[in-house]
From Swiss-Prot:
Residues 1-25 are annotated as: Disordered. GO terms for biological process: translation. Residues 7-19 have a biased composition (Polar residues). It comes from Micrococcus luteus (strain ATCC 4698 / DSM 20030 / JCM 1464 / CCM 169 / CCUG 5858 / IAM 1056 / NBRC 3333 / NCIMB 9278 / NCTC 2665 / VKM Ac-2230). Belongs to the bacterial ribosomal protein bL27 family. The lineage of its organism: Bacteria, Bacillati, Actinomycetota, Actinomycetes, Micrococcales. PROSITE patterns: RIBOSOMAL_L27 (PS00831). Keywords: Ribonucleoprotein, Ribosomal protein. HAMAP family: Ribosomal_bL27. The gene is rpmA. One of its GO terms (molecular function) is structural constituent of ribosome. This is Large ribosomal subunit protein bL27. GO terms for cellular component: cytosolic large ribosomal subunit.
Length: 85
């Protein structure tokens, strides 16, 4: 009987990649158009004035200005206040 006993398997041995979520530009910081402001899952923050939302709920600046966090209708929103020229 030249058989080998079955080796035991492990229930560990896997790890997920980091997601790098969170706020990337804080209130008062200056941004250019296209810069990512918040990476999130779901709409913890909603897009406000001059802010767009990607298909993965990422918020990004549509125009240059400074970031402003606030609340509207009980929701947290992110606005871009255009720089005074």
């Amino acid at each position: 009987m030249a058989h080998k006993k079955a080796g035991s398997s492990s229930k560990n041995g896997r790890d997920s990649n980091p997601q790098y979520l969170g706020v990337k530009r804080y209130g008062g910081e200056d941004v250019n158009a296209g810069e990512i402001i918040v990476r999130q899952r779901g709409t913890k923050f909603h897009p406000g004035r001059n802010v767009g939302r990607g298909k993965d709920d990422t918020l990004f600046a549509l125009s240059a200005g400074s970031v402003a966090f606030g609340q509207r209708r009980g929701r947290k929103v992110v606005d871009i206040v255009p720089a005074a020229e």
